Regions:
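ATP/nucleoside-binding phosphotransfer catalytic cores, i.e., glycine-rich phosphate-binding loops
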Residues: 259, 265-268, 278-341
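Structural motif
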Residues: 73-75, 106, 245-249, 280
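Conserved anion/nucleotide-ligand pocket segment
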Residues: 124-211
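ATP/NTP phosphate-donor binding region
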Residues: 1-70
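Oxyanion-binding "anion nests"
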Residues: 205-250, 255-256
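Long, hydrophobic/aromatic-enriched structural stretches that serve as scaffold segments
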Residues: 67-91
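Charged helix-capping and loop-helix junction motifs
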Residues: 21-24, 55-59, 92, 260-266, ...
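Short, acidic/small-residue loops that bind anionic groups at enzyme active sites
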Residues: 92-133, 307-308
Protein backbone atom coordinates (compact mmCIF):
# COMPACT_ATOMS: atom_id res chain seq x y z
CA UNK A 1 0.00 0.00 0.00
CA UNK A 2 1.20 3.48 -0.86
CA UNK A 3 2.04 5.53 2.24
CA UNK A 4 3.90 8.60 0.95
CA UNK A 5 3.26 10.54 -2.27
CA UNK A 6 5.55 13.22 -3.70
CA UNK A 7 3.91 15.66 -6.13
CA UNK A 8 6.14 17.12 -8.84
CA UNK A 9 5.59 19.81 -11.48
CA UNK A 10 7.73 18.60 -14.37
CA UNK A 11 5.97 20.60 -17.09
CA UNK A 12 3.78 23.63 -16.45
CA UNK A 13 3.66 25.11 -12.95
CA UNK A 14 -0.13 25.47 -12.75
CA UNK A 15 -0.34 23.94 -9.26
CA UNK A 16 1.47 26.95 -7.81
CA UNK A 17 -0.86 29.56 -9.28
CA UNK A 18 -3.53 31.32 -7.21
CA UNK A 19 -6.21 30.45 -9.79
CA UNK A 20 -5.69 26.72 -9.08
CA UNK A 21 -5.58 26.77 -5.28
CA UNK A 22 -9.21 25.70 -4.82
CA UNK A 23 -8.41 22.64 -6.94
CA UNK A 24 -5.25 21.87 -4.97
CA UNK A 25 -7.20 22.04 -1.70
CA UNK A 26 -9.82 19.63 -3.05
CA UNK A 27 -7.13 17.18 -4.13
CA UNK A 28 -5.27 17.29 -0.83
CA UNK A 29 -8.49 16.55 1.09
CA UNK A 30 -9.16 13.56 -1.14
CA UNK A 31 -5.64 12.20 -0.73
CA UNK A 32 -5.96 12.60 3.04
CA UNK A 33 -9.04 10.41 2.78
CA UNK A 34 -6.86 7.61 1.44
CA UNK A 35 -4.65 7.87 4.53
CA UNK A 36 -1.52 8.79 2.56
CA UNK A 37 1.06 11.42 3.40
CA UNK A 38 1.56 14.03 0.67
CA UNK A 39 4.48 16.34 0.07
CA UNK A 40 4.95 18.85 -2.71
CA UNK A 41 8.57 18.82 -3.83
CA UNK A 42 10.41 22.11 -3.14
CA UNK A 43 9.74 23.72 -6.53
CA UNK A 44 6.38 22.15 -7.39
CA UNK A 45 4.35 25.15 -6.21
CA UNK A 46 6.61 27.94 -7.47
CA UNK A 47 4.29 28.78 -10.36
CA UNK A 48 4.34 28.98 -14.12
CA UNK A 49 6.85 31.81 -14.59
CA UNK A 50 9.48 30.37 -12.26
CA UNK A 51 9.29 26.81 -13.55
CA UNK A 52 9.29 27.96 -17.17
CA UNK A 53 12.51 29.84 -16.50
CA UNK A 54 14.09 27.10 -14.37
CA UNK A 55 13.88 23.62 -15.90
CA UNK A 56 16.81 22.64 -13.67
CA UNK A 57 14.53 23.16 -10.64
CA UNK A 58 11.96 20.79 -12.08
CA UNK A 59 14.67 18.21 -12.71
CA UNK A 60 16.03 18.63 -9.19
CA UNK A 61 12.61 17.87 -7.73
CA UNK A 62 12.34 14.63 -9.69
CA UNK A 63 15.82 13.51 -8.64
CA UNK A 64 15.14 14.37 -5.01
CA UNK A 65 11.85 12.45 -5.05
CA UNK A 66 13.60 9.35 -6.37
CA UNK A 67 16.38 9.66 -3.81
CA UNK A 68 14.02 10.04 -0.86
CA UNK A 69 13.61 6.56 0.68
CA UNK A 70 10.30 7.57 2.27
CA UNK A 71 8.60 8.34 -1.07
CA UNK A 72 6.57 5.45 -2.50
CA UNK A 73 4.92 7.24 -5.41
CA UNK A 74 5.76 10.22 -7.61
CA UNK A 75 2.58 11.89 -8.86
CA UNK A 76 2.75 14.54 -11.57
CA UNK A 77 0.74 17.67 -10.80
CA UNK A 78 -0.29 18.11 -14.44
CA UNK A 79 1.17 17.95 -17.93
CA UNK A 80 1.68 21.10 -19.94
CA UNK A 81 4.68 21.69 -22.12
CA UNK A 82 8.48 21.71 -22.47
CA UNK A 83 9.45 18.99 -19.99
CA UNK A 84 11.97 17.99 -22.66
CA UNK A 85 14.09 20.87 -21.33
CA UNK A 86 14.87 18.68 -18.31
CA UNK A 87 16.93 16.33 -20.48
CA UNK A 88 20.40 17.83 -19.86
CA UNK A 89 19.77 18.11 -16.11
CA UNK A 90 18.71 14.47 -15.88
CA UNK A 91 20.97 12.72 -18.39
CA UNK A 92 24.26 14.61 -18.22
CA UNK A 93 26.54 12.68 -15.87
CA UNK A 94 23.89 9.93 -15.83
CA UNK A 95 22.06 11.68 -12.99
CA UNK A 96 18.65 10.11 -13.57
CA UNK A 97 19.94 6.56 -13.87
CA UNK A 98 21.92 6.95 -10.66
CA UNK A 99 18.95 8.43 -8.78
CA UNK A 100 16.16 6.12 -9.94
CA UNK A 101 14.78 3.69 -7.40
CA UNK A 102 11.76 1.41 -7.53
CA UNK A 103 8.85 3.82 -7.10
CA UNK A 104 5.51 4.32 -8.78
CA UNK A 105 5.56 7.16 -11.32
CA UNK A 106 2.19 8.39 -12.62
CA UNK A 107 1.41 11.11 -15.17
CA UNK A 108 0.21 11.74 -18.72
CA UNK A 109 0.20 14.28 -21.58
CA UNK A 110 3.53 16.18 -21.83
CA UNK A 111 4.69 13.73 -19.15
CA UNK A 112 5.01 11.30 -22.08
CA UNK A 113 8.55 12.69 -22.33
CA UNK A 114 9.25 11.77 -18.71
CA UNK A 115 7.87 8.29 -19.30
CA UNK A 116 10.33 7.89 -22.18
CA UNK A 117 13.15 9.15 -19.92
CA UNK A 118 12.30 6.58 -17.27
CA UNK A 119 11.86 3.83 -19.85
CA UNK A 120 15.36 4.62 -21.07
CA UNK A 121 16.79 4.03 -17.59
CA UNK A 122 14.74 0.88 -17.07
CA UNK A 123 11.92 1.95 -14.74
CA UNK A 124 8.38 0.70 -15.46
CA UNK A 125 5.85 3.52 -15.08
CA UNK A 126 2.09 4.12 -15.04
CA UNK A 127 0.30 6.24 -17.65
CA UNK A 128 -3.08 7.91 -17.51
CA UNK A 129 -3.77 10.21 -14.56
CA UNK A 130 -2.36 13.25 -12.73
CA UNK A 131 -3.08 15.26 -9.58
CA UNK A 132 -4.90 18.35 -10.90
CA UNK A 133 -6.95 16.77 -13.72
CA UNK A 134 -8.05 13.72 -11.73
CA UNK A 135 -7.62 13.86 -7.96
CA UNK A 136 -8.69 17.53 -7.97
CA UNK A 137 -11.81 16.94 -10.09
CA UNK A 138 -14.22 19.78 -9.28
CA UNK A 139 -17.28 17.56 -9.03
CA UNK A 140 -18.61 16.08 -5.78
CA UNK A 141 -15.98 13.32 -5.97
CA UNK A 142 -13.37 11.91 -8.31
CA UNK A 143 -15.04 10.47 -11.39
CA UNK A 144 -15.96 6.89 -10.36
CA UNK A 145 -14.11 5.12 -13.18
CA UNK A 146 -11.02 7.28 -12.66
CA UNK A 147 -11.11 6.75 -8.90
CA UNK A 148 -11.41 2.99 -9.29
CA UNK A 149 -7.98 2.74 -10.91
CA UNK A 150 -6.34 5.40 -8.75
CA UNK A 151 -7.52 3.61 -5.61
CA UNK A 152 -6.30 0.25 -6.94
CA UNK A 153 -2.87 1.71 -7.61
CA UNK A 154 -2.66 3.18 -4.11
CA UNK A 155 -3.92 -0.01 -2.50
CA UNK A 156 -1.91 -2.60 -4.43
CA UNK A 157 0.88 -0.75 -6.23
CA UNK A 158 -0.26 -2.09 -9.58
CA UNK A 159 -3.15 -2.45 -12.04
CA UNK A 160 -4.39 -5.96 -12.83
CA UNK A 161 -7.17 -5.39 -15.36
CA UNK A 162 -8.68 -2.54 -17.37
CA UNK A 163 -12.21 -2.59 -18.75
CA UNK A 164 -14.12 0.20 -20.55
CA UNK A 165 -16.11 2.92 -18.84
CA UNK A 166 -19.87 2.93 -19.27
CA UNK A 167 -19.80 6.70 -19.83
CA UNK A 168 -17.58 9.48 -21.14
CA UNK A 169 -17.63 13.09 -19.99
CA UNK A 170 -17.65 16.39 -21.83
CA UNK A 171 -14.48 18.39 -21.26
CA UNK A 172 -14.64 21.28 -18.83
CA UNK A 173 -14.13 24.84 -20.04
CA UNK A 174 -14.58 26.49 -16.64
CA UNK A 175 -12.32 25.50 -13.73
CA UNK A 176 -13.31 28.38 -11.46
CA UNK A 177 -14.55 27.95 -7.86
CA UNK A 178 -18.10 28.38 -9.20
CA UNK A 179 -17.84 24.84 -10.59
CA UNK A 180 -17.08 23.15 -7.27
CA UNK A 181 -19.59 20.35 -6.71
CA UNK A 182 -20.81 20.34 -10.32
CA UNK A 183 -20.18 17.11 -12.21
CA UNK A 184 -19.34 17.22 -15.93
CA UNK A 185 -22.00 16.16 -18.42
CA UNK A 186 -21.92 12.41 -19.09
CA UNK A 187 -22.82 10.34 -22.16
CA UNK A 188 -23.02 6.56 -22.75
CA UNK A 189 -19.79 5.06 -24.04
CA UNK A 190 -19.28 2.24 -26.53
CA UNK A 191 -16.44 0.12 -25.13
CA UNK A 192 -13.23 -0.99 -26.81
CA UNK A 193 -13.61 -1.04 -30.59
CA UNK A 194 -11.51 -3.11 -32.99
CA UNK A 195 -10.51 -1.05 -36.00
CA UNK A 196 -8.52 -3.79 -37.72
CA UNK A 197 -6.52 -6.96 -37.10
CA UNK A 198 -6.86 -9.68 -34.49
CA UNK A 199 -9.05 -9.00 -31.44
CA UNK A 200 -6.45 -10.59 -29.17
CA UNK A 201 -2.78 -9.65 -28.88
CA UNK A 202 -0.18 -9.13 -26.18
CA UNK A 203 3.01 -7.27 -25.31
CA UNK A 204 4.29 -4.55 -23.01
CA UNK A 205 2.49 -1.24 -23.50
CA UNK A 206 4.53 1.88 -24.23
CA UNK A 207 3.55 5.23 -25.69
CA UNK A 208 1.62 8.35 -24.71
CA UNK A 209 0.37 11.59 -26.21
CA UNK A 210 0.73 11.69 -30.00
CA UNK A 211 1.02 15.50 -29.91
CA UNK A 212 4.14 15.10 -27.79
CA UNK A 213 5.57 12.41 -30.04
CA UNK A 214 5.08 14.75 -32.99
CA UNK A 215 7.34 17.27 -31.25
CA UNK A 216 10.04 14.60 -30.91
CA UNK A 217 10.43 14.80 -34.69
CA UNK A 218 9.22 18.27 -35.67
CA UNK A 219 10.70 21.50 -34.30
CA UNK A 220 7.82 23.82 -35.23
CA UNK A 221 6.67 24.17 -31.63
CA UNK A 222 10.07 23.83 -29.93
CA UNK A 223 12.98 24.37 -32.29
CA UNK A 224 15.49 22.54 -30.09
CA UNK A 225 13.34 19.59 -29.00
CA UNK A 226 14.12 17.20 -31.89
CA UNK A 227 17.85 17.89 -31.55
CA UNK A 228 17.82 17.29 -27.79
CA UNK A 229 15.78 14.11 -28.17
CA UNK A 230 18.29 12.83 -30.73
CA UNK A 231 21.26 13.86 -28.57
CA UNK A 232 19.99 11.80 -25.65
CA UNK A 233 18.49 8.99 -27.78
CA UNK A 234 15.15 9.54 -26.08
CA UNK A 235 12.78 8.05 -28.64
CA UNK A 236 12.95 4.24 -28.44
CA UNK A 237 14.60 2.44 -31.35
CA UNK A 238 12.64 0.16 -33.65
CA UNK A 239 14.31 -2.77 -31.90
CA UNK A 240 13.07 -1.46 -28.55
CA UNK A 241 9.52 -1.23 -29.91
CA UNK A 242 9.66 -4.83 -31.14
CA UNK A 243 6.88 -6.91 -29.60
CA UNK A 244 5.38 -4.00 -27.68
CA UNK A 245 1.92 -2.44 -27.86
CA UNK A 246 1.88 1.22 -28.90
CA UNK A 247 -0.41 3.55 -26.96
CA UNK A 248 -1.50 6.81 -28.60
CA UNK A 249 -3.88 9.50 -27.32
CA UNK A 250 -4.57 13.08 -28.39
CA UNK A 251 -4.35 16.24 -26.30
CA UNK A 252 -6.82 19.02 -25.56
CA UNK A 253 -5.47 20.85 -28.62
CA UNK A 254 -7.53 18.46 -30.77
CA UNK A 255 -4.84 17.75 -33.33
CA UNK A 256 -5.93 18.74 -36.86
CA UNK A 257 -6.18 15.79 -39.27
CA UNK A 258 -3.20 16.88 -41.39
CA UNK A 259 -1.01 17.06 -38.28
CA UNK A 260 -2.35 13.70 -37.05
CA UNK A 261 -1.33 12.18 -40.39
CA UNK A 262 2.12 13.75 -40.09
CA UNK A 263 2.54 12.43 -36.54
CA UNK A 264 1.58 8.91 -37.59
CA UNK A 265 3.96 9.17 -40.55
CA UNK A 266 6.84 10.12 -38.23
CA UNK A 267 6.12 7.01 -36.16
CA UNK A 268 5.88 4.88 -39.29
CA UNK A 269 9.20 6.19 -40.62
CA UNK A 270 10.79 5.39 -37.25
CA UNK A 271 9.80 1.75 -37.77
CA UNK A 272 7.28 1.64 -34.94
CA UNK A 273 4.35 0.09 -36.80
CA UNK A 274 6.52 -2.65 -38.29
CA UNK A 275 7.79 -3.53 -34.82
CA UNK A 276 4.79 -3.48 -32.49
CA UNK A 277 2.26 -6.25 -31.86
CA UNK A 278 -0.68 -3.85 -31.77
CA UNK A 279 -1.88 -0.29 -31.24
CA UNK A 280 -4.20 1.14 -28.57
CA UNK A 281 -5.93 4.47 -29.23
CA UNK A 282 -7.40 6.68 -26.53
CA UNK A 283 -10.75 8.37 -27.00
CA UNK A 284 -10.31 11.97 -28.26
CA UNK A 285 -11.76 14.74 -26.09
CA UNK A 286 -15.45 15.30 -26.83
CA UNK A 287 -15.07 12.70 -29.60
CA UNK A 288 -13.71 15.33 -31.96
CA UNK A 289 -12.23 14.04 -35.24
CA UNK A 290 -12.98 10.40 -34.31
CA UNK A 291 -13.97 9.30 -37.80
CA UNK A 292 -11.13 11.04 -39.63
CA UNK A 293 -8.60 9.71 -37.09
CA UNK A 294 -9.88 6.18 -37.74
CA UNK A 295 -9.44 6.64 -41.48
CA UNK A 296 -5.94 8.07 -41.08
CA UNK A 297 -4.83 5.23 -38.82
CA UNK A 298 -5.82 2.68 -41.45
CA UNK A 299 -4.26 4.67 -44.30
CA UNK A 300 -0.93 5.50 -42.68
CA UNK A 301 -0.32 2.17 -40.95
CA UNK A 302 -1.17 0.43 -44.24
CA UNK A 303 -1.08 -3.04 -42.68
CA UNK A 304 -4.52 -4.60 -42.12
CA UNK A 305 -2.98 -7.39 -40.06
CA UNK A 306 -1.73 -5.04 -37.34
CA UNK A 307 -4.33 -4.95 -34.54
CA UNK A 308 -5.64 -1.47 -33.75
CA UNK A 309 -8.08 -0.97 -30.88
CA UNK A 310 -9.67 2.43 -30.34
CA UNK A 311 -11.95 4.16 -27.84
CA UNK A 312 -9.91 3.41 -24.74
CA UNK A 313 -10.63 5.59 -21.71
CA UNK A 314 -7.07 6.84 -21.47
CA UNK A 315 -5.43 10.20 -22.00
CA UNK A 316 -7.10 13.59 -22.17
CA UNK A 317 -10.73 12.49 -22.43
CA UNK A 318 -12.43 11.76 -19.10
CA UNK A 319 -12.75 9.41 -17.37
CA UNK A 320 -9.27 7.91 -17.32
CA UNK A 321 -7.94 4.49 -16.47
CA UNK A 322 -4.28 3.80 -15.67
CA UNK A 323 -2.11 1.61 -17.91
CA UNK A 324 1.10 0.05 -16.60
CA UNK A 325 4.12 0.32 -18.86
CA UNK A 326 6.81 -2.34 -18.74
CA UNK A 327 4.61 -5.31 -17.82
CA UNK A 328 3.00 -7.82 -20.17
CA UNK A 329 -0.50 -6.87 -21.24
CA UNK A 330 -3.06 -9.14 -22.91
CA UNK A 331 -5.72 -7.34 -24.95
CA UNK A 332 -9.02 -9.14 -25.59
CA UNK A 333 -11.53 -6.99 -27.44
CA UNK A 334 -14.24 -9.66 -27.45
CA UNK A 335 -14.00 -9.91 -23.66
CA UNK A 336 -13.66 -6.11 -23.40
CA UNK A 337 -10.64 -6.23 -21.12
CA UNK A 338 -6.89 -5.75 -20.89
CA UNK A 339 -5.16 -7.90 -18.29
CA UNK A 340 -1.65 -7.47 -16.91
CA UNK A 341 0.78 -10.13 -15.74
Amino acid sequence: MIKNIAIVSLSRGVAGEAFAQHEVEIGLKRLAGYGVNVQFMPNALRGIDYLTTHPEARAADLLQAFRDPEVDMILCAIGGDDTYRLLPYLFDHDKLRKAVTDKIFLGFSDTTVNHMMLHKVGLPTFYGQAFLPDVCELGPAMLPYTERYFAELLRTGTIREVTPSDVWYESRTDFSPSQIGIAPAAHPDDGFQLLQGSPTFSGEILGGCIDTFYDFFDGTRYADMPQLCRKYDLFPTAEDWKGKILLLETSEERMPPEKYRAALTHLKNAGVFRAVNGVLIGKPMDRKCEDVYKQLLVEVIDDPALPVVRNLNIGHAAPRCILPFGVRACVDVAAQKITFA
